[in-house]
Amino acid sequence: MFSIRSSSRVLLKASSATTRATLNAAASKTFTRSKYSLPELDYEFSATEPYISGQINEIHYTKHHQTYVNNLNASIEQAVEAKSKGEVKKLVALEKAINFNGGGYLNHCLWWKNLAPVSQGGGQPPSEDSKLGKQIVKQFGSLDKLIEITNGKLAGIQGSGWAFIVKNKANGDTIDVITTANQDTVTDPNLVPLIAIDAWEHAYYLQYQNVKADYFKNLWHVINWKEAERRFEF
């Protein structure tokens, strides 16, 4: 009944071909690259309390996410230089850094956007008349069931990783729940991330310590389903 795909089949890293194409463009004389930066937040750090503390949000945003931004920019600059010098071994090593930090950058951008304070609609379920709301009921029977399945996937992550609720355009716009290790992100063009959930310790440990099940349970109070509805239209 449920359309839940195995993470081993759908967790996708950026391809070598894509990375090479990016570096080719970056190395061209006519290409001007703007550096990546942190996204602007739609709420104050403390606005997601008591479910996610302001302290966690501040450190998560200004330290962890900023580090991915810094490392991504630095890795790209180094890769452009290495390509211009024909340093193939260095390019191969930097490709891994670009994939990791690029994934960390993208995943966290999704994370901040799919959060909303309760005062701004956080936790309010999708509209029953929306395409997303209708698809959830059709596939899972209720939003609670989708959340239950997603929490089960989150609990199964060994070490650090992410869970994504995605729209599968290749399968009739069904909803899938997938997980990724570390900072791997969703790159399949047929999969549209609707909700991204950070299962790294830095996302919860200061508040929930080793009881991450409580974090998984409580974060749904500040999930921005309106944003998920918007993404489902893509």
UniProtKB/Swiss-Prot annotation:
Co-factor binding comment: Binds 1 Mn(2+) ion per subunit.
Annotated Pfam families: Sod_Fe_C (PF02777), Sod_Fe_N (PF00081)
Cofactor: Mn(2+)
Signal peptide as annotated in the record: none
EC number, as in UniProt: 1.15.1.1
Record's keyword terms, sorted: Antioxidant, Manganese, Metal-binding, Mitochondrion, Oxidoreductase, Transit peptide
Subcellular location: Mitochondrion matrix
Reactions this protein catalyses: 2 superoxide + 2 H(+) = H2O2 + O2
Sample GO molecular function, one term: superoxide dismutase activity
Binding positions for Mn(2+) per the UniProt entry: 60, 108, 198, 202
Principal subcellular localisation of the protein: mitochondrion
Chain segment of the transit peptide: 1-34
A single Gene Ontology CC term: mitochondrial matrix
Gene3D superfamilies (UniProt xref): Fe,Mn superoxide dismutase (SOD) domain, Iron/manganese superoxide dismutase, C-terminal domain
Record-linked InterPro entries: Fe/Mn_Superoxide_Dismutase, Mn/Fe_SOD, Mn/Fe_SOD_BS, Mn/Fe_SOD_C, Mn/Fe_SOD_N, Mn/Fe_SOD_N_sf, SOD_C_sf
Domain of life the protein comes from: Eukaryota
Subunit structure: Homotetramer.
Membership in a protein family: Belongs to the iron/manganese superoxide dismutase family.
Function text: Destroys superoxide anion radicals which are normally produced within the cells and which are toxic to biological systems.
Entry protein name: Superoxide dismutase [Mn], mitochondrial
Species in which this protein is naturally found: Candida albicans
